[in-house]
Amino acid sequence: PIILIKESLLKNGINVIDFINNAKILNSKSEIRRAINEKGIKINDIIVSDHKKIINLGFLDNDCIKVSYGKKKHYKIKIN
C-alpha cells in the first residue's frame, strides 16, 4: 500500500515512532516500540534498532520511503 504524509513532518525530522504512528502502520506507540525492540521494523530495508532514530528527507529513495513490518507487510510512504 501507498501512504501519503505531509512534507512538513520530514522537513525538520521526526522520531521513527511518531513517523510510523502518523503513517498508521501500527495501532499504538507501544506496539511500535515493541516491534522495534524485536527488530521487526525496517526502513528502506535497514533494520531499525533505535527507537530514538530521526527520519528526515534524507531517507527518501525515488520520492518514497519503504517501511516494512514483519516479513510480509511492506508500505511505501510518499510525500504529499
Show which residues each predicted segment covers.
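Conserved nucleotide- and phosphate/pyrophosphate-binding catalytic cores
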Residues: P1-N80
